[in-house]
């Protein structure tokens, strides 16, 4: 069995975690983490959108309807990129593009059209019908609903983009101080810390390294006996 990718859940919300399913966005060769519909289902399982049994049901249904699953995967990527552009723009102080909001609206409309009232422990809740198995589009619906919730409730000043040169992941800073800088301290933050450490080490080594100079043969001040036998030996600079 192929080893599954462990998705990072550092975005602070489901929709931002979906946006971050492209690794090294700012590099010349970004890495797609959703190459198949099965990977989309695995992302949904790891993110808590579906249970493990529901994920297996989705994969079986995708096997029976491969063309439908492929179309939903394509829609998921389009939605992901729209989410990324919207929230990365807000993090930079730019308003969203109408075309990207239209993508969100389209998926959100379908998601809410499928919602229905479901009994809960205390009253009712809005949920998607699962009696006949989870719909193949369920991961998209959950991400679109999450994006709407963040857009309508989160402080845009708390939206940030990881400053690492090749990363570009976005996240919602939910720390009390609002000073979170990296997508994940154990990832980009740790690498930046290591680079600063090695830079200091190299700088310190260069500053403390002794410098040597060599006298040219026959230079002034060299003893006559050494001029006769050849070049003088290098002497330590004062």
Residue map of PLM features:
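Basic DNA-binding region of bZIP-type proteins
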Residues: 187-207, 211, 218, 222
């Amino acid at each position: 069995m192929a080893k599954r990718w462990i998705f990072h859940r550092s975005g602070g919300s489901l929709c931002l975690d979906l946006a971050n399913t492209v690794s090294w966005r700012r590099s010349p060769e970004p890495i797609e983490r959703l190459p198949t519909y099965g990977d989309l289902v695995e992302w949904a399982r790891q993110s808590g959108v579906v249970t493990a049994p529901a994920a297996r049901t989705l994969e079986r249904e995708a096997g029976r309807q491969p063309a439908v699953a492929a179309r939903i995967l394509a829609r998921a990527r389009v939605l992901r990129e729209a989410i990324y552009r919207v929230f990365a723009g807000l993090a930079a102080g730019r308003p969203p593009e109408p075309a990207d909001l239209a993508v969100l609206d389209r998926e959100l409309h379908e998601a809410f059209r499928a919602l229905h009232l479901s009994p809960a422990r205390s009253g009712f809740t809005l949920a998607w019908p699962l009696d006949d198995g989870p719909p193949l589009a369920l991961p998209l619906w959950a991400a679109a609903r999450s994006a709407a919730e963040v857009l309508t409730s989160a402080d845009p000043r708390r939206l940030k983009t990881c400053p690492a040169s090749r990363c570009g992941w976005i996240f919602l800073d939910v720390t009390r101080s609002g000073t979170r800088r990296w997508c994940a301290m154990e990832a980009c933050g740790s690498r930046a810390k290591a680079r600063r450490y090695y830079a200091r080490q190299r700088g310190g080594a260069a500053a403390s390294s002794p410098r040597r100079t060599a006298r040219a043969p026959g230079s002034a001040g060299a003893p006559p006996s050494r001029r006769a036998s050849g070049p003088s030996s290098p002497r330590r600079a004062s």
